[in-house]
Amino acid sequence: MTSGHALQPERPERKGETALAVEQLRRSFGGVPAVDGVSFGISRGEIVGLIGPNGSGKSTTVNIVSGSLRCDSGRIQLGGSDITNRSAYEVARLGLTRTFQIPRVWGQLSVAENLLVAGTQLADESATRALFGRRALRRRQLDLESRLFDILETLNLSSLAKQAAEVLSGGQKRLLEFGRILMSGASVLVLDEPFAGVNPVMCRALQDIIESLRADGCAVLLIEHNLQAVEETCDRVIVMATGKIIAEGSLAVVRNSEEVRSAYMGTAS
């Protein structure tokens, strides 16, 4: 499996520029805080791990950030856009793509069709036609087709291009999810346990894809229980417990925090 770096739509190199900013996020259920004053930022070209024990508020946080859940208060900035409490569809159109613990694919569509749909996610065909005419729209379609073939080859999915996505193995569906990211050209990625249930070879392949996306200027928020993969992949980590951020820094540093040890009941050591 080759690197996906060359396959990405061109993005300006702006490493260090804030891509995602979360400020004082709060959400309660039945009066019980699930997310309580969470604030963090991620820069372009940075991979940040979000870890914590079960019930720490990680899932609620990423659901809010990706538009799947509304917050009670707080603010979320995606680049220069305020995406607070905007729908998942709107958030995706603005450049934030999310994967899930269990890979989600459009089962009735073929592998190639899944990728093509992702490629049109950030573009409005009617607007393209109105502004630039049919010739420009056709050029964009040809570009999508070219990227499609490159990505299928890179992910070793060429032989499955016409296969219905619903019959793929779990690992193949995970690859297809990442292929859709490559097609979409998203600038911020929220990856929810991408290494869960995959073998070491597949884990390494996914890490290579994530690294290529980072090299291309993507900002990545990685939610993961596999601490070895987190240490190998992330620039820094954020640790949550009881709805709050309790530590932030390198994994080597935060795992020695007494508060982190207490939250994990010793499992983080």
Regions found by a protein language model. Give the residues of each.
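Catalytic Walker B motif of ABC-type/P-loop ATPase nucleotide-binding domains
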Residues: 189-193
